[in-house]
Amino acid sequence: KTIGMLLAAGIVGLSTAVLSAVSVGGRVPSPRTAGSVNAGLDLMPDIVSGLNLLAGEKYETLPSANGIGVWNGEEVVPMDTEDYIIHVTAAEMPATYEKEALKAQAVAARTFAMKHLTGELRCKSGHTICTDYACCQAFLTTEQLRERWGSSFENYYARIEAAVHETEGLVLTSGGELVTALYHSSSGGRTENCEAVFAVALPYLVSVESGGEEDSPEFTSEKCYTTAEFISKVNSAFPDAQMSDPAKDVDVWQRTESGRIQLIRLGGTVVTGQQLRNALKLRSTNVKFSITQSNVKITCFGFGHGVGMSQCGANAMAKNGSSFDEILQHYYTGVDIERFEVDSGELCLLPEQTNE
């Protein structure tokens, strides 16, 4: 999947609203009150244009901070922010996942939405946020969910609604600032450093182990080609490759800490792992080749860019008894879980945090 949005690594300071930020400190402040359309938000454009820092742009006030305007491709639909998070969570994570995993997903999705509301993340449509998973976050309407879930609709919707309500207003911060809460379907066993994918280092997006994913259908996938098919696809995507013999013309030059291909020689050209993934429509850049005289088999580990929270890993942690805050603090290193409070229709980060 590709993304046309611009990611921001810095937080915008807003000065005119009230955020009651309560650090978790080992526990979460009490809240006030199955099948996804895609395999996790995969924020992966290409290695060059994936991350754009919006340094210096300030958005001081936010009208209608209790809600969010969602562009559906035809019009902007005003929604309550928490209702929006329900529909995003339903689209981004299977409803059959463990409740604590669904809660972790809701917090990540809410953080991502708040980054859009503050103007730190930009939608390529020019609107605040859209329903295109390749740009912002996946989104399914109630009617689409009924069609997808059939007779399980009431049960599945209630599960996701509860996960969102039980984490109402909670977001992820680092140093008092909203984080860029990237997530993906499956890491293949270990997540990736942000700089290895997006060329920007973020202290909370670092490589961590992600155990328990082996039983997920997203953990591995295979693509098999005849030698002629593989040569044709490679030479079509990369004319300078001029490949003739895959056994001699495929050479992995560099892998990341988690095993993902960073650079690979294909005949007479060298490309990035992401360029290879795009060209062959692979699920990830963590791949291994098995080449014979007649065939080329590519085994992929994981699904997605591998940065941030692995949804399959989150579900595995939840099955093993981890709470949603433990899941989030595992995948987003050193973050705090805080609550947004809106006053006078405006939103900001309160400079001072209070511990509870």
Describe these PLM feature segments.
Residues G67, M79-E98, V206-E218:
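Acidic/histidine-rich, surface-exposed loop or edge segments in extracytoplasmic proteins
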Residues I11-S23:
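Hydrophobic alpha-helical membrane-insertion segments, chiefly the h-region
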Residues K1-I11:
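N-terminal Sec-pathway targeting helices
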Residues A90-P94, V107-G119, G169, N235-P239, ...:
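Sec-exported extracytoplasmic/periplasmic mature domains
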Residues V24-W71:
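N-terminal, intrinsically disordered, polar/charged segments of Gram-positive cell-envelope systems
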Residues T111-V296, F301-G302:
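Extended substrate/cofactor- or partner-recognition/assembly subdomains adjacent to catalytic sites
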Residues E75-M79, T96-V107, C224-A228, G304-G308, ...:
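Soluble non-cytosolic domains of exported or imported proteins
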Residues T272-E356:
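C-terminal soluble interaction/assembly domains
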